[in-house]
Curated annotation (Swiss-Prot):
One term of GO molecular function: urocanate hydratase activity
Organism, scientific name: Agrobacterium fabrum (strain C58 / ATCC 33970)
Protein's UniProt keywords contain NAD: yes
Similarity section: Belongs to the urocanase family.
Role summary: Catalyzes the conversion of urocanate to 4-imidazolone-5-propionate.
GO cellular component, as recorded: cytoplasm
Cofactor descriptive note: Binds 1 NAD(+) per subunit.
Protein name from the UniProt record: Urocanate hydratase
Gene encoding the protein: hutU
Length: 557
């Protein structure tokens, strides 16, 4: 094999109750690692790329094989250490310790940039883990659908009296994360025009029912949008094109969407963003032969792209950055007012973070969709008054196609996550579920990320860049007994702009699991409430008091 990162084999997670490892605590990370590379889940699985430009699950195929072999042989009192996608050690710990500890793409701050990372990457010394790619808890595009839905719903509340019927959203990017936008828009009641340069990605979203139609010309796409909005229908179209060309053209034509955003992979100027005027084939070739030229051309195109977004904003169109760092690139390229429009977290999501509410998710290791439907019902039973959440679960069941192992995303917060975890564990114990479930979250959560251009943008106390919080979150989840814990750098917004942590815990129906679940699923969201209370948010302070958190330096208790 000439390229250690390319292999033609297909990987799929085992299903059912037969173990391939020594216990469910090691079977769980094994299955979720393999699930990340399922052809129905990953963007470029043969290259180990899960999503987000070059977000990988393992450094090389040899490393993947070594991780799999080690997990199969790992004892219940041992912990596997994974350094940027490479299994570097196994150490004796104890039964309540994590079975896997992962660190991906972390660099000393002075060297935390794409140029230095790319040098290490070429030498085989590093791997970009994105957020859930290298931490083995990616569940396909569903993983971001509800967060995007919540954002669009809140935008509708703020700007259109809570009604997006007859409205349409303009966006770019239909990759693993951006692909959620059309479906989220439709669920929120709006139409969506999503610009994507790679036709295979549009076809992937059509196949998985995340987008309703495909267009090859702007006129064709606008005709569909006009037809649907006039009829009051909520539908979406993926337009084959370049956002850096389409956005300015729409503005020049006098077309005014009702909401404008973008989720191209602008965080990675080489692998994530097609320069204006280039073909996809030319772009792919020059990524290898002349990456600096690609980056320069992409950055120049991003400046044009963001200028169009600023123009829409100045024209009165609600416009939001969706966390890909495109404003920062445009500013670095000389666009002084690139940050004229806000990021989605300070504009719409932060009140949820203040209560520890974020992208809680779980996957059925059995592979049986019925296990997810049963847990959906359990969520409704335990949270009977949360009709907004019930509506989400109903829409998710109807509209979201499972990718790989069946899974569910469900935004809940402190006080509810541990109750759900314990209930799922009991369902495994009594046989309601056919096999254990794993419970995790995105790194995009209330207490697990420092990202000044995204999750921690415009913090009330100016603590946007303080990254103690995700480090403490990872340490606390390790001490609390999560099944695997990860600490990453650069996810979402690229090298030098974020640090973040993840956790996953397996509910196998045992008493030991119940104790760990109660600790982890309380402590993890509690760190988010703590972080926001420390920053001076009244909602977080009130939540901390209601939940009885002991925060001596914040509450004085």
């Amino acid at each position: 094999m000439n390229n250690p990162r390319h292999n033609i084999r297909d990987v799929r997670a085992p299903q059912g109750t037969e173990l391939n490892a020594k216990s469910w605590m090691t079977e769980a990370p094994l299955r979720m690692l393999m699930n990340n590379l399922d052809p129905d889940v990953a963007e470029r699985p043969h290259e180990l790329v899960v999503y987000g430009g070059i977000g990988r699950a393992a450094r090389t195929w040899d490393d993947f094989d070594r991780i799999v072999a080690t997990l199969k042989d790992l004892n219940e009192d041992e912990t596997l250490i994974v350094q940027s996608g490479k299994p570097v050690g196994v150490f004796r710990t104890h039964k309540d310790a994590p079975r896997v500890l992962i660190a991906n793409s972390n660099l000393v701050p002075h060297w935390a940039n794409w140029d230095h990372f790319n040098e290490l990457d070429k030498k085989g010394l590093a791997m970009y883990g994105q957020m859930t790619a290298g931490s083995w808890i990616y569940i396909g595009t569903q993983g971001i659908v509800q967060g995007t839905y919540e954002t669009f719903v809140e935008a509708g509340r703020q700007h259109y009296d809570g009604n997006l019927k007859g409205k349409w959203i303009l966006t770019g990017g239909l990759g693993g994360m951006g692909g959620a936008q059309p479906l989220a828009a439709v669920m929120a009641g709006a139409c969506c025009l999503a610009v994507e340069c790679d036709e295979t990605r549009v076809d992937f979203r059509l196949r998985t029912r995340y987008v309703d139609a495909k267009a090859h010309t702007l006129d064709e796409a606008l005709a569909l949008i006009d037809q649907w909005t006039k009829a009051g229908e909520a539908k979406s179209v993926g337009l084959i094109g370049n956002a850096a060309e389409i956005f300015p053209e729409l503005f020049r034509r006098g077309v005014r969407p009702d909401i404008v955003t973008d989720q191209t992979s602008a965080h990675d100027p080489i692998h994530g963003y097609l320069p204006a005027g280039w073909t996809v084939a030319e772009w792919r070739a020059k990524q290898e032969s002349d990456p600096k030229a690609v980056a320069a051309a992409a950055r120049a195109s991003m400046k044009v792209h963001v200028q169009a977004m600023v123009d829409f904003w100045n024209a009165g169109v609600p416009t939001l950055d969706y966390g890909n760092n495109i404003r920062q690139v445009a500013k670095d390229e000389g666009l002084e007012n690139a940050f004229a429009f806000p990021g989605f977290v300070p504009a719409y999501i932060r009140p949820l973070f203040c209560r520890g509410i974020g992208p809680f998710r779980w996957a059925a290791l059995s592979g049986d969709p019925e296990d997810i439907y049963k847990t959906d019902a359990k969520v409704k039973e335990l949270l009977p008054d949360n009709k907004h959440l019930h509506n989400w679960l109903d829409m998710a069941r109807e509209r979201i196609a499972f990718q790989g192992l069946p899974a569910r995303i469900c935004w809940v917060g402190l006080g509810d996550r541990h109750r759900l975890g314990l209930a799922f564990n009991e369902m495994v114990r009594n046989g309601e579920l056919k096999a254990p479930v794993v419970i995790g979250r995105d790194h995009l959560d209330s207490g697990s990320v420092a990202s000044p251009n995204r999750e921690t943008e415009a913090m009330k106390d100016g603590s946007d860049a303080v990254s103690d919080w995700p480090l403490l979150n990872a340490l606390l989840n390790t001490a609390s007994g999560a099944t695997w814990v990860s600490l990453h750098h650069g996810g979402g917004v690229g090298m030098g702009f974020s640090q973040h942590s993840g956790m996953v815990i397996c509910a196998d129906g045992t008493d030991d699991a119940a104790r760990r679940l109660e600790r982890v699923l309380w402590n993890d969201p509690a760190t988010g409430v703590m972080r926001h209370a420390d920053a001076g948010y009244d909602i977080a302070v009130e939540c901390a008091k209601e939940q009885g958190l002991r925060l001596p330096g914040i509450l004085g208790n």
